[in-house]
Amino acid sequence: MGRDTPVAPAGPDLGRPDARAVFVTQWYVPDRAAGTRLLDEVADAWRAADPPDGLLAFHAHLSTDGDTVLAYAQARDPDAYRPFVRSLRGAARAEPVEYRLRRGVVLASSARPPGCAVVATFDVDGAERQDRIIESVVGALDGAPADQHRGMLSAHFHTSTDGSRVLNYARWTSDEAHEAFLAGATRRATLRATGATPGVRPIGFKRYHLHHAIDLGRSRTGRDRSTS
């Protein structure tokens, strides 16, 4: 298919109440063209398969620097995901990190779909550190004037089931809004919050554009709302 531009849908419904588990998979690629091919391969594998009822939605992204593909899959039944992906072929079989949504913060609303998603991850020493770093970052956001994070629509914090990771999926109005945030005071406050928390090691962040969105519930009823 060769698509190299993001699609229009709003991305995953991060706060949907029936999503009991989230599975995140990353692939590292040499360049944007390879990333686009991999995106298409994995999304096509999901579309061609017969997903179990326990899976809800699949969203695939490419980083703006073109070196990372990220898939974000939501499941009603946490036990349904791994047997399904192991039945697929090629890159779609890759093992994910399993998360639970711990907290969501909505900072602004927009009539337009988000322009990008920024995914930040942290390596942490157990469940208590997971909760501590989430509270620290949320506190930094809550304490900042709105003009210091203009363009940030929401931040949704996920904790890995093995206690080793925290993932923040943040939605932004545009790449430019996120770039402005990186130069501002709130960004510095969040860095201080993460750096001052023992047992927490920031891994970094990537900015992504959405390329594929598959609503598995609609696919099963014959009303496929997938986009590519």
Which sequence ranges carry the predicted segments?
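Short S/T/G/P-rich N-terminal loop/turn motif that feeds into the first structured element of a domain
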Residues: 1-228
